[in-house]
């Protein structure tokens, strides 16, 4: 299953980080589609979100006649308090939380990722979808999609599909459609999805 949908791996890796951080430090993090990990730093509404980026995930995939190769990169700000804050600082300040070492966090991330990969391989994206949505930041978020010709359309984020691409709903047309992460930039603070600039 994963060989036909390698794009889902970045979402599983992000979820593994969120689960591992919660398990090892008690800190609850969230996922910004497609691959960033954030800490909610204050009370907010859908339009006023106060977030601090704590990490991210990147996956590079290649295939040949021998199969699929994935290279996974995971970054978490564990100890660097500047320019914003570190995970261990947040954990120390949180009641019931505590610092975690690199080795313990990496082991926990890999354990969670292995479990998630096994679950998806056995039963599909649906096996982990609800856990993913508990951690992600975008349920019912209004955004504006801009296509390559510059046309804009207001839509509502409704989820991710079985490949990990963003599903949105347009009230005007009544249609759902998919927004791919490749070639698009998601400015969550501005509520805008637009084609990435090519240099």
Language-model segments: which ranges?
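Long, positively charged amphipathic alpha-helical accessory segments at protein N-termini or as interdomain linkers
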Residues: 2-29, 39-199
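Short loop/edge segments at beta-strand edges and connector loops
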Residues: 31-33
């Amino acid at each position: 299953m994963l060989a036909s949908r390698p794009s889902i791996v970045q979402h599983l890796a992000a979820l593994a980080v969120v689960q591992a951080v919660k398990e090892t430090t008690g800190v609850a993090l969230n996922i910004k589609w497609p691959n960033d990990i954030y800490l909610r730093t204050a009370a907010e509404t859908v339009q006023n979100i106060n977030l601090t980026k704590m990490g991210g995930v990147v996956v590079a995939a290649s295939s040949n006649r021998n199969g699929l190769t994935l290279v996974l990169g995971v970054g978490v700000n564990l100890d660097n308090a500047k320019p914003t804050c570190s995970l261990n600082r947040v954990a120390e300040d949180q009641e019931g939380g505590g610092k975690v070492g690199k080795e313990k966090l990496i082991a926990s991330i890999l354990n969670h990722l292995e479990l998630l990969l096994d679950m998806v391989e056995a039963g599909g994206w649906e096996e982990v979808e609800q856990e993913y949505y508990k951690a992600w930041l975008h349920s019912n978020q209004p955004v504006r999609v801009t296509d390559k010709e510059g046309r804009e359309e207001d839509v509502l984020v409704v989820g991710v599909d079985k490949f990990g691409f963003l599903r949105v709903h347009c009230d005007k047309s009544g249609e759902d459609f998919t927004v791919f992460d490749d070639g698009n930039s998601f400015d969550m603070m501005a509520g805008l999805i637009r084609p990435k600039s090519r240099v």
